[in-house]
Regions:
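Formylglycine-dependent sulfatase
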Residues: 1-182
């Protein structure tokens, strides 16, 4: 018995927007409705998220993954398209739109808004990355247990989604800056 269903049973209108991380991805888990963005995460070849459907209408022929950074990559890059096409913008806009058009007199609203970022890919619009130009981003913390994982990985040679390795402090700081800006 999931919380959205409990609230729905108590008279709420329940809605989820953004990353839900479900499978199958169109199961509502008690929500009256959802608008999904799984940021490229596809477990069902027949599933296309609401964000990607919207993106195809807004930017025909363009690629929402234009940075080339994928789900679970720890590399970083600047979002290459208009920031109004970014998944973070879409999620916020969908939530604001629902709230502004919702009649609170009808029944109480439970709205779950789940932004896919700062999860990878680390692809913020440039203006947000600029906020961290002079930020003091600390070197990665390395514990005593790291010895068994200490194999030196060169970022150009390593898979961008490798679970561990020494990618070098500058690589990690750059990824963190993009994470913060996301």
């Amino acid at each position: 018995y999931e919380m959205p269903q409990m609230l729905k049973d108590a008279g709420y209108y329940t809605f989820g927007i953004g990353k839900m991380h479900w499978y199958p991805q169109r199961v509502k888990h008690g929500f009256d409705g959802t608008l999904l963005d799984e940021s490229g995460r596809r477990q069902d070849p027949h599933f296309t998220s609401d964000y990607r459907q919207w993106f195809q209408v807004q930017a025909p022929g363009k690629n929402p993954d234009a940075t080339g950074i994928w789900w679970n990559d720890h590399g970083a890059g600047v979002y290459k398209l208009d920031e109004k096409l970014h998944t973070t913008y879409w999620t916020g806009e969908m939530a604001c739109n629902l709230i502004s058009h919702y009649d609170p007199e009808s029944r109480p609203l439970f709205l779950k808004v789940s932004f896919a970022r700062p999860h990878s890919p680390y692809d913020p619009p440039q203006r947000f990355l600029d906020m961290y130009d002079n930020a003091d981003v600390p070197d990665p913390a390395i514990g005593d247990w790291c010895g068994r994982y200490a194999k030196q990985l060169n970022p150009e040679e390593a898979a961008s989604d490798a679970p561990y390795g020494n990618f070098g402090n500058e690589y990690v700081r750059n990824s963190k800056r993009h994470y913060y800006a996301n």
